[in-house]
Curated annotation (Swiss-Prot):
It is an enzyme of class 3 (hydrolase). The lineage of its organism: Bacteria, Pseudomonadati, Pseudomonadota, Gammaproteobacteria, Enterobacterales. Residues 2-261 form the NodB homology domain. This is Probable 4-deoxy-4-formamido-L-arabinose-phosphoundecaprenol deformylase ArnD. Catalyzes the deformylation of 4-deoxy-4-formamido-L-arabinose-phosphoundecaprenol to 4-amino-4-deoxy-L-arabinose-phosphoundecaprenol. The modified arabinose is attached to lipid A and is required for resistance to polymyxin and cationic antimicrobial peptides. Pfam families: Polysacc_deac_1 (PF01522). InterPro entries: ArnD, Glyco_hydro/deAcase_b/a-brl, NODB_dom, Polysacc_deacetylase_ArnD. GO terms for biological process: 4-amino-4-deoxy-alpha-L-arabinopyranosyl undecaprenyl phosphate biosynthetic process; lipid A biosynthetic process; lipopolysaccharide biosynthetic process; response to antibiotic.
Length: 297
């Protein structure tokens, strides 16, 4: 049976309150354990609207029919009013996710600010953002945070160095092909990385595939994937407007003898045997701006 890591990104307040319970129900029905990464601070995702001035982002929003896909409340969150604190109000859902047998990790304190400003933040600012997120998630789940996946895959060597002090068991901060040990700025090796290898819905819809053909498209990608495959879904998409389609995909995956699992299950017993690599800034198909991408050492 082929194993594929299933990563669930929770970016927004509504994605938490509506998408998480629905996905927990769907995953329980199929007896699947996944890795959930929560945004825990203010939901300011609506402040991404200024990026509509950038052609690549505008095209992404148009081809994915973002208003219908996400809903206006998500697209406008934190614009005309302060963003609601997610973990403060909804921390019980993070604890519920953990109690359901899933891995729970940190995505971001402020998802929008991380994507917009991480490349310019000082070391102190980076540290503050991660610490705010870790502290809020610890408060919500009542135990240490074992894993993390930065917002929008916006990570480079500076980010990795800052995250070392938080003692995560693994990170999933980049796009790539297989788990590896990243080289830090001082030449030492950092916490193991488990890259996302497969495309997300919003990266390919309207470019490589029509909406009605997406399930077969991504299933074919899974069947043909090499390395150590990892697939990312979002509570705002697969847990809401596309939840029916996602449930159908799980049935298709099962018929192909593919099993989804939490990301930590993809690691070998001895991580010292993993290859060494780097995370570098790079453009990525279907995304606007730079992402952290795996590079062989």
């Amino acid at each position: 049976m082929k194993q594929i890591g299933l990563r669930v990104d929770v970016d927004t307040y509504r994605g938490t309150v509506e998408g998480v319970p629905k996905l927990l129900k769907i995953l329980a029905k199929h007896q699947i354990q996944a890795s959930f990464f929560f945004s825990v601070g203010p939901d300011n995702m609506g402040r991404h609207l200024w990026r509509l001035l950038r052609p690549k982002f505008l095209w992404k929003m148009l081809r994915s029919n973002a208003a219908s896909l996400y809903g206006l409340d998500i697209l406008l969150a934190g614009t005309a009013w302060p963003g609601k604190k997610i973990a403060k109000d909804l921390g019980y859902l993070m604890k519920q996710t953990l109690n359901a047998g899933h891995e729970v990790g940190l995505h971001a304190w402020d998802h929008q600010r991380w994507q917009a400003k991480v490349g310019r933040w000082s070391e102190a600012q980076l540290t503050e953002q991660v610490k705010l997120g870790v502290d809020a998630l610890v408060q919500a789940i009542g135990q240490r945070v074992t894993c993390s996946a930065v917002a929008g895959w916006r990570a480079d060597e500076r980010v990795l160095a800052v995250k070392q002090q938080f003692g995560f068991d693994y990170n999933s901060d980049c796009r790539g092909t297989h788990p590896f040990r990243p080289i830090l700025p001082d030449g030492t090796l950092g916490t193991v990385q488990i890259p996302v290898t497969l495309p997300t819905y919003d990266e390919v819809i309207g470019i490589q595939v029509k909406d009605e053909d997406f399930n077969q498209f991504i299933l074919d990608k899974m069947k043909n994937s090499q390395g150590v495959p990892v697939y990312t879904i979002h509570t705002e998409v697969e847990g809401m407007s596309k939840s029916t389609e996602f449930a159908t995909l799980l049935e298709m995956v099962h018929q192909e003898n593919i099993q989804f699992c939490a990301l930590s299950h993809l690691l070998p017993e001895n991580i010292q045997r993993l290859p060494v690599g780097r995370i570098v800034r790079s453009e990525f198909p279907g995304r606007e701006g730079w992402l952290g991408c795996q590079q062989e050492a």
